[in-house]
């Protein structure tokens, strides 16, 4: 099983990247926060979760071990596959997902595309006592929610989407910025967001 991959980034796609290692190109599915930091032609080191199914072998990659740890917890829940877990980690920062699970914030979790209320409730029920508290460190309880509901957050997301950036990356970056400072204006979020997305 592949647990770690080090190589050159050949291509960054919508939901994955191609990493060349030992002359072989591996397609690795990654959350938006990881994809946004991969640059074609540059080296990359990814923590890998190798998922084997009847019809395919899939690689999921993360720049940090916290994201991998949370991914493992999410896919351990009945009815939650790797793609849905990746959607959660793309739409919200790791700290916001962890905080949502710890605090039982079903509304926040179900605001992510593809995550219904019942799935969010099941995630909370099964993971509330399993998520390490350090994963939520530094995240105000409303951090993830702020990105999705504040006027500044919504305006910043709309503006960045209009500039052609991908929605999962935009939502992740804006949520991360608002988690650091919930009082930021839309202009500040757009300016800082552009710096992170380019």
Swiss-Prot record:
SMART domains: HhH1
Keyword field: Cytoplasm, DNA damage, DNA recombination, DNA repair, DNA-binding
Superkingdom of origin: Bacteria
Main location per the UniProt record: cytoplasm
Entries under Pfam families matching the protein: HHH_5, RuvA_C, RuvA_N
Compartment annotation: Cytoplasm
Region (Domain III): 150-198
GO terms, biological process: DNA recombination; DNA repair
Residue numbers spanned by region Domain II: 64-142
Region of interest (Domain I), residue spans: 1-63
GO cellular component: cytoplasm; Holliday junction helicase complex; Holliday junction resolvase complex
Region entry Flexible linker, spans: 143-150
Record text about domains: Has three domains with a flexible linker between the domains II and III and assumes an 'L' shape. Domain III is highly mobile and contacts RuvB.
Entry similarity comment: Belongs to the RuvA family.
Subunit structure: Homotetramer. Forms an RuvA(8)-RuvB(12)-Holliday junction (HJ) complex. HJ DNA is sandwiched between 2 RuvA tetramers; dsDNA enters through RuvA and exits via RuvB. An RuvB hexamer assembles on each DNA strand where it exits the tetramer. Each RuvB hexamer is contacted by two RuvA subunits (via domain III) on 2 adjacent RuvB subunits; this complex drives branch migration. In the full resolvosome a probable DNA-RuvA(4)-RuvB(12)-RuvC(2) complex forms which resolves the HJ.
Function statement: The RuvA-RuvB-RuvC complex processes Holliday junction (HJ) DNA during genetic recombination and DNA repair, while the RuvA-RuvB complex plays an important role in the rescue of blocked DNA replication forks via replication fork reversal (RFR). RuvA specifically binds to HJ cruciform DNA, conferring on it an open structure. The RuvB hexamer acts as an ATP-dependent pump, pulling dsDNA into and through the RuvAB complex. HJ branch migration allows RuvC to scan DNA until it finds its consensus sequence, where it cleaves and resolves the cruciform DNA.
Protein name: Holliday junction branch migration complex subunit RuvA
Source taxonomy: Bacteria, Thermotogati, Deinococcota, Deinococci, Deinococcales
Gene: ruvA
């Amino acid at each position: 099983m592949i647990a770690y991959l080090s190589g050159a980034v050949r291509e960054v796609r919508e939901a994955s990247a191609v990493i060349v290692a030992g002359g072989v190109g591996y397609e690795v599915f990654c959350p938006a926060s990881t994809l946004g930091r991969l640059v074609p032609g540059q080296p990359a080191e990814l923590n890998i979760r190798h998922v084997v199914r009847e019809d395919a072998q899939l690689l999921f990659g993360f720049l940090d071990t916290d994201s991998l740890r949370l991914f493992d917890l999410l896919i351990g829940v009945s009815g939650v596959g790797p793609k849905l877990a990746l959607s959660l980690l793309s739409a919200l920062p790791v700290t916001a997902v962890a905080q949502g699970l710890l605090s039982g914030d079903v509304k926040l979790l179900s605001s992510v595309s593809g995550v219904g209320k019942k799935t969010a409730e099941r995630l909370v029920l099964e993971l509330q006592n399993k998520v390490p508290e350090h994963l939520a460190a530094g995240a105000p309880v409303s951090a993830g929610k702020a990105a999705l509901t504040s006027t500044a957050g919504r305006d910043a997301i709309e503006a960045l989407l209009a500039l052609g950036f991908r929605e999962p990356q935009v939502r992740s970056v804006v949520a991360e910025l608002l988690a650091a400072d919930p009082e930021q204006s839309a202009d500040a979020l757009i300016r800082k967001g552009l710096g992170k997305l380019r």
